[in-house]
Amino acid sequence: MVQAPSVYVCGFVERPDAPPKDACLHLDPLTVKSQLPLKKPLPLTVEHLPDAPVGSVFGLYQSRAGLFSAASITSGDFLSLLDSIYHDCDIAQSQRLPLPREPKVEALHAWLPSLSLASLHPDIPQTTADGGKLSFFDHVSICALGRRRGTTAVYGTDLAWVLKHFSDLEPSIAAQIENDANAAKRESGCPEDHPLPLTKLIAKAIDAGFLRNRVETLRQDRGVANIPAESYLKASDAPDLQKPDKALQSPPPASTDPATMLSGNAGEGATACGGSAAAGQDLISVPRNTFMTLLQTNLDNKPPRQTPLPYAAPLPPFSHQAIATAPSYGPGAGAVAPAGGYFTSPGGYYAGPAGGDPGAFLAMDAHTYHPHPHPPPAYFGLPGLFGPPPPVPPYYGSHLRADYVPAPSRSNKRKRDPEEDEEGGGLFPGEDATLYRKDIAGLSKSVNELQHTLQALRRETLSYGHTGVGYCPQQGPCYTHSGPYGFQPHQSYEVPRYVPHPPPPPTSHQAAQAQPPPPGTQAPEAHCVAESTIPEAGAAGNSGPREDTNPQQPTTEGHHRGKKLVQASASGVAQSKEPTTPKAKSVSAHLKSIFCEELLNKRVA
């Protein structure tokens, strides 16, 4: 009784266009040609296991694309095992194309998708010692992954359907394969079933799971073999074991527990990370008090934020036209204003004698429009032209917006040293305070710290206590005059110079040397220190009613500027010798009294 095979398996076992890396896998074309056609069928095994034959190879054929193999699977036990595997294997049941269901074929494509030819090693001679010859081809195995590229196996119950998947196979060879299959069907009897070594088959399946890049290599083999997509091959699909039902794809209900509830992107990020946040593996619980302590410590350790310096508005450009076209200045004289306009600030400004009334003060509305593009510069030497503009608040950036500017912190504030007696130990409760001793080094340190503190206080007093005296970067250029009624035709004046950086605050004696206002007029608030450029000879020949009686006033710009440089680079000792204003003297005297009391309390009674 002849039993037809249940499943056919065909494929290339060697491709010359994809040579293997190992030299022992190369097949000599002359040797292959001498061994064909086969004199008898070759065994078909699983994973090269000798005790696991499942069918026979009825032909090997040399084509232009490579060596082609055709075999049939006839083992009943193995076919029954394939049916059982199919019902429990998700990969075997997956299909990319709508093809008829074939449990055995689909299970074979998922488990054993490659062919492997076992041939004689090239270094071993075929001739034996007794004069016999060894068979060059030993057997063909169906396996998880072959070592030669392009050895993809195609399974099917119809031999013609299997052969049409190989587009590189010549039609003449395909016809010869069908003839040989029919001849083998007639000559073969009832196949003998051998018990399958299930333990070895499971071990080989486990080993196949650790093959590196197995799916990618199978896709490469399919491309080399030039097999179209309409087949049961699983190498074209990446494994996808997680295919939940539609009911499971709906989002879970939102949690109402405030301890585990996440909102917004936090919940989405936890889901995208594999639910680690929900599982609680990457999270730790910290008490609220501990968390607040850590947060406060982190904030305390941050460096202090640097307060930006006030933005100094650029000086308005100097215009010679305002001086050249100005009429003679005197009581009631007006000024010719350039084209344009500006708005004055509330409170008005000092404009000199207006309308013959000495000491007149012009009060302006907050929105009074004046034909000037910018507020006029303050010409202090010419009281009949313009007066000092209102103080300008510190600006940040380019927007006219006043902000609060905190005073710099006292970084060098003196700290008290721990009180220790001469033996180095502390005072216990009840001990007399007269036992307190302090060495000379400690006293020197306290004196140095107090000197630095006095210097810092003096600088702060000069910077913030006398803001109206000194250089003002927001105002216009300043001029000096020797007469009470302003500029004379034979006098010379100096074009103001722009200073890239504001000079240090002036000393108190410079502020005290400011010129008094002309008689009969109200003196405006000083905004800058005048620099005289008129020589003494010219001043003596002046026709002004008031003479300069202050011999200590600097007469040259270089002398005044040198004084500024000295002030900028003065040390603490030099500053202590300079005269100060009465307000600075009072502060210094108060600090000296505090220092004396501090020393008296620390000294030995």
UniProtKB/Swiss-Prot annotation:
From which residue to which does any coiled coil extend? none
| The organism's place on the tree of life at top rank | Viruses
InterPro entries from the xrefs? Herpes_virus_sf (IPR035443), Peptidase_S21 (IPR001847)
Q: Which SUPFAM superfamilies match?
A: Herpes virus serine proteinase, assemblin
Broad enzyme group? hydrolase
Motif Nuclear localization signal: which residue numbers? 410-416
Q: Name one GO molecular function term.
A: identical protein binding
Q: Where is this region: Disordered?
A: 235-274, 403-432, 489-588
Region listing for Interaction with major capsid protein, in residue ranges:
585-605
* One GO CC term on file: host cell cytoplasm
Q: Which UniProt keywords apply?
A: Host cytoplasm, Host nucleus, Hydrolase, Phosphoprotein, Protease, Serine protease, Viral capsid assembly, Viral release from host cell
Marked site positions, Cleavage: 235-236, 568-569
- Extent of Polar residues compositional bias: 568-579
Which family does the record claim for this protein? Belongs to the herpesviridae capsid scaffolding protein family.
Query: Domain remarks in the entry?
Result: Region of interaction between pPR and pAP is called Amino conserved domain (ACD). The region of interaction with major capsid protein is called carboxyl conserved domain (CCD).
Name the record gives this protein: Capsid scaffolding protein
**UniProt source species:** Epstein-Barr virus (strain B95-8) (HHV-4)
